Amino acid sequence: MEIISDKAAMAARSEAVRREGKTIAFVPTMGYLHEGHLSLLKRGRSLCDYLVLSIFVNPTQFGPNEDLDAYPRDEERDRKVAQEAGVDVIFMPNNEMMYGPNYQTYVALEKLPYHLCGLSRPVHFRGVATVVTKLFNIVRPHTAIFGEKDFQQLAVIRQMVKDLDFGIEIIGGPTVREPDGLAMSSRNAYLTPEQRKDAVALYNSLNQAQEMVSAGGKSAAAILEKASETILAVPGAEIDYAKLCDPATLDDVEAIAGPTLMALAVKIGSTRLIDNKVLEP
């Protein structure tokens, strides 16, 4: 396994791999890898000849007063996880490499970012779309794998790849969960032991919503009211959003008429957690 920090060297390596007729799978991350990331890497390993992992805590997707400086980092552990997954190259650029002096070009979508997380994090998806565009141009993968836990991010990237003719296959990897159902996330490291127990309320509310839909429930208001009750029973929990929406457009729905995305963003203490589930009637 090789570690590359220079973007020209990464581009040259990808070009050499392509000249050999090999296919490249790419998993972009911000590091602090967990079993969810490992599942994406294993998927990439199974799909292509060559596997690239990027680790870059992207400053442009964090707004003021968000957790950029506090975001957890553990390079040694990340390297072990990457080795276990069969990664060929870890691309680890720094801020100066990705955003040089007088940097002024950004990628922004018109509609998808202005739902769900974008309502409270207005610059987030501009930063995501920009850094992913740059990484795609450097790594030049045939396939890229993203987690379905970040459903809106996956939707934004799929739309961007389609609109801008990247010619890259985008694959979503299922959410990987702890034994009690909590979605794996690097930010889970912020939780105290008590908050960690309480955080399973997100998963429980999603399951309750599916039970209501399976029993014939169609009212979005009723489903969301029940979810809010479950979450707000947790001391100190604060709901950023709880939404039922069209999985394709992310527009809110008032009634369940087919597969419907339920998406949650909740603060447990100071830690913001997200989760989602596509509810099936």
UniProtKB/Swiss-Prot annotation:
Protein's name according to its UniProt entry: Pantothenate synthetase
Function: Catalyzes the condensation of pantoate with beta-alanine in an ATP-dependent reaction via a pantoyl-adenylate intermediate.
GO biological process, one term: pantothenate biosynthetic process
Family annotation (InterPro entries): Cyt_trans-like (IPR004821), Pantoate_ligase (IPR003721), Pantoate_ligase_C (IPR042176), Rossmann-like_a/b/a_fold (IPR014729)
Tagged with keyword Ligase: yes
The protein's assembly and partners: Homodimer.
Catalytic residues identified in the record: 37 (proton donor)
Misc. remarks from the entry: The reaction proceeds by a bi uni uni bi ping pong mechanism.
EC numbers on record: 6.3.2.1
Residues given in the record as beta-alanine binding sites: 61
Organism expressing this protein natively: Desulfatibacillum aliphaticivorans
